[in-house]
Curated annotation (Swiss-Prot):
GO MF annotation list: arginine-tRNA ligase activity; ATP binding
Catalyzed reactions: tRNA(Arg) + L-arginine + ATP = L-arginyl-tRNA(Arg) + AMP + diphosphate
Annotated gene: argS
The protein's name in its UniProt record: Arginine--tRNA ligase
Keyword terms, alphabetized: Aminoacyl-tRNA synthetase, ATP-binding, Cytoplasm, Ligase, Nucleotide-binding, Protein biosynthesis
UniProt source species: Phocaeicola vulgatus (strain ATCC 8482 / DSM 1447 / JCM 5826 / CCUG 4940 / NBRC 14291 / NCTC 11154)
Lineage: Bacteria, Pseudomonadati, Bacteroidota, Bacteroidia, Bacteroidales
Length: 606
């Protein structure tokens, strides 16, 4: 039983004894005492005024007096401010609470059981015509952290990815490679496969624009105005016509085109795997659009037969969503080709066949809000049980400060380049501050990797996902303030203290003995540690990993003040020294768990 539960039981007894009334536990409202008042927990007295038939101040005084007299092991002091009773919890209660946190190897984490709900989380969703970029970084980090948070709340979690591996954009890279590649491979070029294919996507665009420019001038010379000439040039570009023909052949299962498609996509997947590994994200199941788009068509036709959808004169299939306050939505074009919505329905069908899904969460940018509103309704109409409860984990754009780390094209920042730059910056900053002194080259490189990637991940994850954000590389690697490196350094500092204690032969017992006089700072730290359980729960119910990130920062900020104000290893009172070591060890444990949920490593030394 935790402190709040014990206190609630004592307050119920107080009301019964003082006012002769039985009250349910939910009527007892306890909250953290505001910093300007003395105490740890505050009871809201107003619900009991009808029972006491007295004013709020007097009622608070009576309940406080009863608790101090009849539960001195729980309440050591109290003060009343209007209708609020501020209660100071006895020191031994805090030690007991610390012991319970220490006894739990994974405090705050709820394990899934056989009967736990299954949550599927889709994130990443790359195209196979280019490398992952800065936008994917935010998506991957959010998806991975959210999966960890949902698992920590006792859910079975399946992490899934849908790869956009078909369509005209893929054919553009394929065609450019055939025309200009001279058989170049990742091995011959020394490039990652995704970067190599990305180069050919850019090459297609360059040649296509030059072709359109030339044709536009030709059509203008023949008497068309600029707008008409450009439209005709785009429609008649030989390069684009070839790309469309290649797509037609792909859809007709042309063996040569399919073999080329497979070869080039395999290069890209090998590149993606390296990026994902460096980023520390993984998937339990990967779906490919080339396998799902036909399934979607089938499901739409099934919905048409059942009268959920209707067909227009041009043979296209639509959903009428006006009853739901939306408009009419295209599901199949007149020529039978699918749209994104069809593909999402197909992917949903396959997933539902593969897993007994209770909740489906899509981690996709906020520009797709309407799309997922529609998808939820369509899936529900088609009989997918989780359709109505579908969650679109919508997030805002992420940008870089102007002029920072632009790629050669000057528009997109590759994830690989960004991570490499972060590790390099971490190495320079750490070396300047002496944080790599005395380490081998291998150890220093590993610290730079942990700090660089930790800085990137934390800076992105501390921001509420719904907000647009600017990622500032230099600011993120600051060892002071609300940053990953500040939290990592505090963890390493704690491990250093614990190593020194072990070298001095000091052993932290499994149970810290009672009878110590604790400071308000020490009690406050234990209270913060205990809060971790509710922080994890809130992050899960709100789908908000930033709650955990900011909790970790608040915790290490408090610990650093404690570290500054109190002696640990130099404390003369042995019992107090051991208590402070135990407190430090448990702060380290919770910091490591919290950062782990965000996908961030913490170094044992720095």
């Amino acid at each position: 039983m935790n402190i709040e539960e014990k206190l609630t039981t004592s307050i119920i007894s107080a009301i019964k004894t003082l006012y002769g009334q039985d009250v349910p536990g939910k009527m007892v409202q306890l909250q953290k005492t505001k910093k300007e008042f003395e105490g740890h927990l505050t009871l809201v007295v107003f619900p009991f005024l009808k029972m006491s038939k007295k004013g709020p101040e007097q009622t608070a005084q009576e309940i406080g007096g009863y608790l101090k007299e009849h539960a001195p092991e729980l309440v050591s002091a109290y003060n009343a401010v209007k209708g609020f009773l501020n209660l100071t919890i006895a020191s031994d209660c805090w030690i007991e609470l610390l012991n319970s946190i220490q006894a739990a190897p994974e405090y705050g984490i709820e394990k899934a059981t056989e009967n736990s709900p299954l949550v599927m989380i889709e994130y990443s969703s790359p195209n196979t015509n280019k490398p992952l970029h800065l936008g994917h970084v935010r998506n991957n980090l959010l998806g991975n952290a959210l999966a960890n948070v949902m698992a920590a709340n006792g859910n079975k979690v399946v992490k899934t990815n849908i790869v956009n591996d078909r369509g005209i954009h893929i054919c553009k890279s394929m065609l450019a490679w055939l025309k200009y590649g001279n058989g170049e491979t990742p091995e011959s070029s020394g490039k990652k496969g995704d970067h190599l294919i990305g180069d050919y996507y850019v090459a297609f665009d360059k040649h296509y624009k030059a072709e359109v420019k030339e044709l536009t001038a030709q059509y203008q010379a023949e008497g068309l105005n600029e707008e008409e000439a450009k439209a005709k040039a785009e429609a008649n570009s030989p390069l684009m016509l070839e790309a469309r023909e290649m797509l037609r052949k792909w859809e007709a299962n042309d063996p040569e085109i399919r073999a080329l498609w497979k070869k080039m996509n395999d290069w890209v997947y090998a590149g993606f795997d390296e990026t994902y590994k460096m980023m520390g994200v993984s998937f339990d199941k990967i779906y490919y659009e080339s396998n799902t788009y036909l399934e979607g068509k089938e499901k739409v036709m099934e919905g048409l037969e059942k009268g959920f959808f209707y067909r227009k004169e041009d043979n296209s299939v639509w959903a009428d969503l006006t009853a739901e306050g939306l408009d009419h939505k295209l599901l199949l074009r007149g020529d039978g080709t699918s749209v994104y919505m069809t593909q999402d329905i197909g992917t949903a069908k396959l997933r539902f066949q593969d897993y007994p899904i209770n909740k489906m969460i899509y981690v996709v940018g906020n520009e797709q809000n309407y799309h997922f509103q529609v998808l939820s309704i369509l899936l529900d109409k088609l009989g997918f049980e989780w359709g109505k409860g579908l969650v679109h984990f919508s997030y805002g754009m992420v940008e870089l400060p102007e002029g920072k780390m632009k790629s050669r094209e000057g528009t997109v920042v590759d994830a690989d380049d960004l991570m490499e730059a972060m590790i390099e910056t971490a190495k320079e900053t750490s070396a300047e501050l002496g944080k790599l002194d005395g380490l081998t080259q291998e150890e220093a490189d590993n610290i730079a990797r942990i700090v660089g990637l930790g800085a990137l991940k934390y800076f992105i994850l501390k921001v509420d996902a719904r907000k647009n954000m600017t990622f500032n590389p230099k600011e993120s690697i600051d060892f002071n303030g609300n940053t990953g490196p500040f939290i990592q350094y505090t963890y390493a500092r704690i491990q250093s203290v614990l190593r020194k204690a072990a070298e001095a032969g000091i052993v932290i017992p499994e149970i810290i003995p009672a009878g110590l006089e604790l400071s308000a700072k020490e009690e406050g730290l234990i209270q913060m540690l205990a809060d971790f359980k509710s922080v994890v729960k809130q992050a899960g119910s709100d789908y908000n990993p930033s709650i955990i990130a900011n909790y970790a920062y608040d915790l290490v900020k408090e610990y650093n003040q404690f570290y500054h104000d109190f002696s640990i290893l130099r404390e003369e009172n042995e019992a107090l020294k051991v208590f402070r070591l135990a407190l430090s060890a448990n702060v380290g444990k919770i910091v490591k768990t919290a950062m782990g949920l965000l996908g961030i490593e913490v170094p044992e030394r720095m």
